[in-house]
Swiss-Prot record:
Function: Required for the formation of N(7)-methylguanine at position 46 (m7G46) in tRNA. In the complex, it is required to stabilize and induce conformational changes of the catalytic subunit.
Organism the protein comes from: Schizosaccharomyces pombe (strain 972 / ATCC 24843) (Fission yeast)
Family that this chain belongs to: Belongs to the WD repeat TRM82 family.
Pfam families referenced in this protein's UniProt entry, alphabetically: WD40
Subcellular location per the Swiss-Prot or TrEMBL entry: Nucleus
Name of the protein described by the UniProt record: tRNA (guanine-N(7)-)-methyltransferase non-catalytic subunit trm82
Length: 421
């Protein structure tokens, strides 16, 4: 029997704390923080179980961290894992991340974010959306004695049995979809800067815009997708870009909910990269200062860059080949617009990260700063197999989707009338 190869476990989720200039990497059940200046690991948190080895893999999957969000002032960080545990952290000091509370939520979380007044907004796989504040954590048995401090990268023991015994407080949703929720965004209302809206998407091609926190008041819908919506991102406070199981990504005006453009992403990928499978959009990353948007698709080793015109149309800009499938991408510096890309090293046994910078001609160029090399070599977790499934978005596609049939039969892909070119 051949020996299993040891590799650095990839990061399924990335986010950047711009106030303190560090990145948070979710690597299976590990929550890792690294300084963007030095590459030093500033904190590490992981579930530590006492069960025997044959159940350890299942435990690691259950503790896989799927989402991380920071409050607007970066004083709080929220994380949620596969085992439906919502955690709230004090992130005031980057070298001393303190776990304040953790509490189970009724169903598995699909996405979460912070609202402007520091409430945590999260949606579950059944389509319900909830809004809680810090006081919600204290309504059960979670108390000061159940905290865990991460000091200088070392975690103090947590009494997990006691924490899991906390009674679940009855939660009432502020809104709901009749389908699996895929993403949510709380943003400034483009028609009234003093108000907020909540944008939600689901498996059944819907994008809904509602008032926040009075989400029962629906402002409108952005309709045009023909398959599930997996990713949304704000280009500015009135322009939304969305993608999913379609061959196109869409640009929406949030003031009148009209489609401004439908950009043929499949053609962009198929021209420059090998593509013989249905597309699933996994990353939409606006680079506002350069009037660009970067797109990645699940399982594909490349990025597509599109130019945003003044009329909010998308025009093909460039394609960039990478050394492995993209898992996530995040802007590391809004001054230089450097992009950090997480790669699925469980396939390539190679690099976990690649970086993109832009030259004077606005062309995307691959680079690997020493800081990122240090994070990759010294900071990531070594393993012989993935702790958890890393690519899951494609499971949202329905078996009767025409985007599957068009690939299987070799026919031309379904088209959407586009306003570009």
């Amino acid at each position: 029997m051949s020996e299993q190869r040891v590799f650095k476990h990839p990061c399924q989720f990335l986010t950047w704390n711009s106030k303190h200039n560090y990145i948070v990497c979710c690597s299976g059940p590990y929550l890792l923080g690294f300084s963007c200046s030095t590459g030093e690991k500033i904190f590490e948190h992981c579930y530590r179980d006492n069960i025997n080895e044959k159940h350890r893999e299942a435990a690691a999957y259950g503790e896989a961290i799927r989402q991380v969000a920071f409050s607007k002032d970066y004083s709080r960080m929220a994380t949620v894992s596969e085992d439906k545990c919502l955690r709230l952290w004090d992130s005031t000091q980057p070298d001393k991340i303190e776990l304040l509370y953790q509490k189970n939520i009724p169903k598995r979380c699909a996405d979460l974010c912070f609202a402007g007044s520091n409430e945590i907004v999260f949606g579950d796989k059944f389509g319900d959306v909830y809004c809680v504040d810090e006081n919600w954590f204290t309504t059960s048995e979670v108390t000061e004695e159940k905290k865990s401090n991460v000091v200088e990268g070392k975690q103090e023991p947590v009494n997990n049995d006691t924490l899991k015994d906390s009674k679940l407080q009855k939660l009432e949703p502020i809104m709901g979809h009749v389908s699996i929720l895929t993403q949510l965004i709380v943003a400034q209302n483009p028609q009234n800067s003093k108000e907020e809206i909540i944008i939600t998407s689901d498996k059944d091609e819907h994008i809904r815009i509602s008032r926040f926190p009075n989400a029962f008041v629906i402002e409108g819908f952005c309709l045009g997708h023909e398959d599930f919506v997996s990713r949304m991102s704000l280009y500015d406070n009135r322009t939304l870009i969305s993608g999913g199981g379609d061959n196109h990504v869409f640009v929406w005006d949030l003031e009148n909910f009209k489609c401004l453009d439908a950009f043929d992403l499949r053609s962009a990928f198929s021209t420059y990269l090998s593509l013989n499978q249905p597309m699933v959009v996994s990353v939409i990353l606006p680079i506002f200062k350069r009037q660009l948007v970067a797109f990645a698709c699940e399982g594909m080793a490349g990025l597509i860059f599109a130019k945003v015109t003044p009329e909010k149309r998308l025009l093909f800009h460039s394609a960039l080949k990478l050394s492995g499938p993209v898992l996530d991408a995040v802007l590391l510096d809004t001054d230089t617009d450097q992009i950090l890309i997480s790669l699925d090293s469980s396939f390539t046994f190679g690099a976990c990260f690649e970086c993109v910078k832009f030259d004077e001609g606005n062309a995307a160029v691959l680079t690997k700063p020493d800081v990122i090399k240090r994070i990759e070599s010294d900071g990531l977790i070594s393993t012989e197999k993935p702790f958890c499934p890393l690519a899951q978005i494609h499971t949202l596609r329905k078996n009767h989707s025409k985007f599957i049939r068009s690939v299987e039969t070799g026919t031309s892909s379904p088209s959407v009338e586009s306003k570009d070119n």
